[in-house]
Regions:
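N-terminal, polar/charged subdomain of small-to-medium soluble alpha/beta proteins
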Residues: 1-113
């Protein structure tokens, strides 16, 4: 009797996509909940270099942003956006690697069937 394992694994890429969407939703929530733990303003007017540290899930992320001195919160929001962009890039890379592994697994299953 021949069992076709390939059909069982055919939705693996879809499962990976759904998992990555869950991760993205979690980090979208982070973008609203990140806590400002340190903000250091250095330099002279009219521009300052603003160091913004964000803390989330036991990790601290620091960014420097050169902003007009009038609005330091802009630097904080910019740092959150930059962090979210970086997280998105990392998740995209993870997704691509997972999809590649899924394709390899499918090919291996197909060859051994």
């Amino acid at each position: 009797m021949h069992i076709n394992y390939y059909t069982k694994h055919i939705d693996l890429e879809e499962e990976i996509s759904q998992e990555m969407e869950k991760k993205m939703a979690k980090f979208e929530k982070f973008a609203d909940e990140a806590t400002l733990i340190d903000l250091t303003v250095e330099g002279d007017l009219p521009k300052k270099s603003v160091k913004v540290s964000l803390h989330y899930n036991d990790a601290t992320h620091s960014f420097y942003a050169c902003e007009e001195a009038k609005d330091v919160m802009t630097a904080f929001n910019t740092a959150k956006e930059e962090l979210f962009t970086e997280i998105t890039r990392v998740i995209g890379k993870e997704r691509d690697q997972s999809r590649s592994k899924a394709r390899q697994a499918k090919e291996t299953i197909r060859q051994t069937s």
